Amino acid sequence: MSPAFNIPDSIESSRGSSQSPHHGLNPEEMADIEATSQDNAVRVGEEIDYFAAQLDRYDADQTGSPPERRSRAFQLVDSYYTFTRKRLDRLRERQARQRSAQRGSWQRAGSIEMDLDDADEENDDILDEELQQLEDEVQIWDLLRRILPLRYHDATQNQKKEHDGSTKSRRQWWNEFMVSDSVARERKVVLEWLQNSASYGPPIDEVVSDLQHNAERGDILAHGWLHTRHKIKLQKSVNAYQGVLDPRDAAAAQSHLSSNSLITQLDPDAVTRQARKLEPQDESFERAIWLGCFEMLRRGCSMSEIREWLAVRTELWRAFSIAPLPLSNPDDEEQPDFDPVSLILWRRMCYAIATDGGTSDYDRAVYGLLAGDIPSVEKVCKTWDDVLFAHYNALLRTQFDLFLIKHGGDAAAKAAQQFPSFNAVAYHGDPATATKRLIDSLETGMKTSAEAFRPAKALQAAIVADDLDKFLFHQGLLLSIRANKKEKSKLIPEYPFPHESFSDKKYYDLGDHQGLRILAHVLIIILTLDRLSGVAKDKGPLQARHQAAENSIAAYISYLRLVRLEEMIPLYCSKLHGPRVYSTLSRNLIHIVDIDARLHQLTIMRNLGIDVSEFVKSQPLIYLDDVQDELVSCDAKDQFKILEDGPATLKYGRLVKPDFFGDDADYVDPEDDALIRSMEWLLLVPGLFVETCAYAVRIYKYFLKRTRLRAARAFSRRVRGHEIIRTKFPNLLKDVDENDPAAWFEEFAAAQLPSDLLESCPASQEKLITITRHLWELESLVRALDSIETLTSLAALTREESVPMTREMWQEVSQTVRIAKACMRPVLKEWLLTTYDGRSVEQDFLDIRQAYIPETILAYISCLHFAGTSLSRDNLLECMDLAAIIAEKDSDVAKEFMRCGRMKELVEAFASASKALAIWSGEKKGSQTNSKKLRELGWSRELWSIKS
């Protein structure tokens, strides 16, 4: 399958870089679809295009076995990491260039420069915020690309191997350990992730620069303790000492040495052995060296890198003291004949130094790392990552130590008992819950709590703790709470879950569009991998939680709508489940009015495997459900009043209210317009004829019950019954007659319906004809009312002396009268009373008849009255014919007038028309009449003429 839509391949997008989350959307914009369908204030970055393109390419290739498709999902995560890493690197380079330029500008002076500096500081804040966001995102994708292949793997991978007693290399021991312990494999991956993240920090030399500066040795990195060596030489020279100074010597005790408690020898152990100090400058140098060593171990540097850094400082001996196990870095030298006993003992020696030796926190932390100790390392930790690294390092080293003791023979077990060591596994307790408890503790730690409550770090924590489902569930709940805070959201519904206590600060907000993008793609990838593993969270007891988690995708889709990236919306909607696919599609595409754009969207949906028939069928139901059309009572019975109070006039009959559709003729309420648009979408998909007509009838019923006349008129113009049939059955009807727009139904009812329609139709032919008839009858009423309003407005113009009536205006009156007559024809006989299969008439139809028939017919009589006195008396004769029709036995129209007690008004209207017919003799030239037809019916003008 080819990609559903075209997106630039290059990560260098033509769009500008995205703004920081703080300057993005606000929650109200995200939650309120009626407020706006587009937002020009939100900038779109290249990451939007790239992420969608990669996801689309993954979707386009659904071939292969589950393991192969799983592998492609992992490649998708890799692509997101690589892209985000490149963006971060470019941003760092840009920041470096800007700061370099700013340093040059600081040489200038003046008030203008001060203003520019303020602006630069503001730009720096924005840049720093964007940099932090990118660093967080890089960490998220890096962690996922490392840990997901471990959690979603074939059962045949990493099978345990039997341990034999043969000699093994260090790497073989390590590999066997990894194969045997799945928890250790995951902890190793997390450690490598933390090391990789740290490796992109400032250069080591920059990290130790402050301590190096305090060492007061300029650019001299080598030659050890310069200031202490100089002091010792000075004392020996002054006092003419030969050989090594002995601090126990009485003469030495009375010398300069006693006042500062300086060491007397320069070997590495002198400070601890003599319990004396270095010169302050050398203490700074010493701390700088150990800080550098700690940072390199923290970053996962290879032993060759550590040796090189220390060799420059002539401190190579330190490299040998930390060599035995830098967590089996592949770049490090192999040890062919590895003796587990040596490592077991060496770890315990490091523990002794970390707890009882050392000269500063940093050298104790270095040996604490190597020993798998936690307290000594935590002392120098500054960040959430540092503390997690300290614990995971201790856990992994303890696990390996226990593995060596178990499989290293009696000698290994005996060596382990000789000296104490820190058992991190026992320290953390139950292995099944150790990670989650550790992550929870980071939320309360003084050094880590603030960082732990940042959403990006909380997401990383959830991934590490394998608690992502809970995080995404709570994230979805929070989005739902925020979206429905002020009013009910149609995009992100409320969920009736029992209250669960969680901190809002840990989760992304609706306005954080970068966070929403990350969340959406993380959730999509997790759901994809779950599905490939046979886990269906969208069904069963987890279904409700899954639906809440999907709020992240729904919120991101809404963001795409706001930034006018509608092409991407079907792609992300296809990742939702159940009816939400179609409801989310509809909510976010309903604003599209261009037909070509709608057709393009339908093409994208088909390419993505979305059922377009189900989509267009579901749309009207969604918006009908919004307005609860079937629960709405018929307000029109009290509200539909279009006749003026007062008696009829000789020329105009009883006056009709002008502009009774409303002052703004073209305005349609957004709720009503959504219903109409949903039907326009339905016309674009072949078939579904019965559904189209049935929905149209429901929409007309709703509009008429609520007296939404403008909406009903717009519906009759934009979704005509004639066009529905022409669209669904192109060759069934002729072109519509503009003078008789209601004639199409008789043609349809008399036509031979296509056999394929009858075969595929879920309804009988009788039902099909009846539903279409109801559509025709409702549309006819609306178009008749539209014509009546137009005639009322024209009649009002004739009453204004300042407005002369032109020939064109009279022609419009004549044309409108003809349309009104044609559209009133269905209303005058058994309107909405036809049923099928012996069913009774719907109550809604009875209510609409009661509300509209009396008022509409009285207004229609007034229009014929006006036309008769203004155009041709034949229109007055038609009033008489109408009176005869209504007077027929069993007339359903007469029954409506009797039911509502308005028969007197009807008689008075006909009496006024008959009086005008008797008196009025004027005739407009060129007016078209129905004289021949009237004579055939037995009517004659002369019959009504009064001769003087």
UniProtKB/Swiss-Prot annotation:
Q: Which GO terms describe its cellular component?
A: nuclear membrane; nuclear pore outer ring
The signal peptide stretch is: none
- Name recorded for this polypeptide: Nucleoporin NUP84
Q: Which UniProt keywords apply?
A: Coiled coil, Membrane, mRNA transport, Nuclear pore complex, Nucleus, Protein transport, Translocation, Transport
Name of the gene this protein is made from: NUP84
Q: Which organism is it from?
A: Chaetomium thermophilum (strain DSM 1495 / CBS 144.50 / IMI 039719)
Coiled-coil regions, chain positions = 118-148
User: What molecular function terms (GO) are annotated for this protein?
Assistant: structural constituent of nuclear pore
Instruction: Report membrane topology.
Output: Peripheral membrane protein
Its family remark reads:
Belongs to the Nup84/Nup107 nucleoporin family.
Principal location class: nucleus
GO annotation terms (biological process): mRNA export from nucleus; post-transcriptional tethering of RNA polymerase II gene DNA at nuclear periphery; protein import into nucleus
| Keyword field contains tRNA processing | no
The record describes its quaternary structure and partners as: Component of the nuclear pore complex (NPC). NPC constitutes the exclusive means of nucleocytoplasmic transport. NPCs allow the passive diffusion of ions and small molecules and the active, nuclear transport receptor-mediated bidirectional transport of macromolecules such as proteins, RNAs, ribonucleoparticles (RNPs), and ribosomal subunits across the nuclear envelope. Due to its 8-fold rotational symmetry, all subunits are present with 8 copies or multiples thereof.
Q: Where in the cell is it found?
A: Nucleus, Nuclear pore complex; Nucleus membrane
| Polar residues bias locations | 11-21
Segments of this protein annotated with the region Disordered:
1-39
State the protein's purpose: Functions as a component of the nuclear pore complex (NPC). NPC components, collectively referred to as nucleoporins (NUPs), can play the role of both NPC structural components and of docking or interaction partners for transiently associated nuclear transport factors. NUP84 is involved in nuclear poly(A)+ RNA export, in NPC assembly and distribution, as well as in nuclear envelope organization.
